Amino acid sequence: MALKLELSDEKLLGELMNALARQGCLADRIAPNVCRVVYPRTWTAREAQLELQFFVRAWQANHPGVTAVLSS
């Protein structure tokens, strides 16, 4: 299942997409500040969403002030 990830700072979206790719995610930009993400290492959509939320929050800790919204 693909999830949509919207970032408040479009200049950092490429960096986040690269970080996601290093973790085995497939991500493609669908708007200047939005990407579609698939995490194939999970069994369910709920598991994928939880894993991605955890990863994005950890990434945000190194990027104060950047907001990220994950949705289906």
For each feature predicted by the language model, list its residue ranges.
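Short glycine-/aliphatic-rich beta-strand segments at the starts of folded cytosolic domains
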Residues: 1-7
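Structural motif
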Residues: 7-9, 40-41
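Intrinsic disorder/low-complexity detector
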Residues: 8, 14, 18, 67-72
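Short amphipathic alpha-helical segments
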Residues: 8, 12, 48-51
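A short, structured beta-strand/loop element
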Residues: 14-34
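C-terminal basic regulatory modules in eukaryotic proteins
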Residues: 39-72
